[in-house]
Amino acid sequence: MERFIKEKYPQVSHIVLCGADEEAVKDADIISEATSVEKRRWPVLKPEWIKPGCLIISSGTMDFSDYDFMVKDIRKIVDNYPMYEEYIEIYEEWDENGKRLSSGIPGMYYVNMVDDGKIGRSEVTELGEILLGEKKGRKSDDEIIMVSVGGMPILDVGWGYECYCKAKEKGIGTTLNLWEKPYLY
């Protein structure tokens, strides 16, 4: 991994490889989690590893070892609340005893908290509300914030365009003709 980073990203001057979840996140100012792992084998995040004022950004899945900590001690922010409501309709799973299985997705945890009456809907902030000035961003220096970024399609369009521009710049790729004339033209 270190060789790959040095070859591909020479501007990165400081690399620390970690062998355990705690080592990677303990006392960090920012934790950015973007993992792709087997279901229910997610990285673990324990409250005692998180320092006051930490910003946690999750675009993947994680195992929060203390559900009550999520309910009581973190600021909950999502990119698109209705998207997580839809995720629950599609992806939520239950065990044979009728117990809800963890999804690993913070935004789904937040919707479940609201549905279960543990928090009010107003306790989950959407990024757009912050951008429009309807709600504050950080409320205090000690506030622990967890942002769930679940994959809005517009991000796929943006990344697709970036890939297209890079391929065009390098003269690689295959041009695909999707239509002779657009249908609604």
Locate the predicted segments by residue.
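Rossmann-fold NAD(P) dinucleotide-binding segment
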Residues: 26-27, 38-55
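Short glycine-rich, flexible loops that bind phosphorylated cofactors or substrates
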Residues: 39-41, 64-65, 85-86
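Short glycine-/small-residue-rich Rossmann-like dinucleotide-binding loops
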Residues: 35-37, 60-61, 81
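Redox-cofactor binding/interface segments in oxidoreductases and associated redox assembly factors
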Residues: 32-33, 57-58, 78
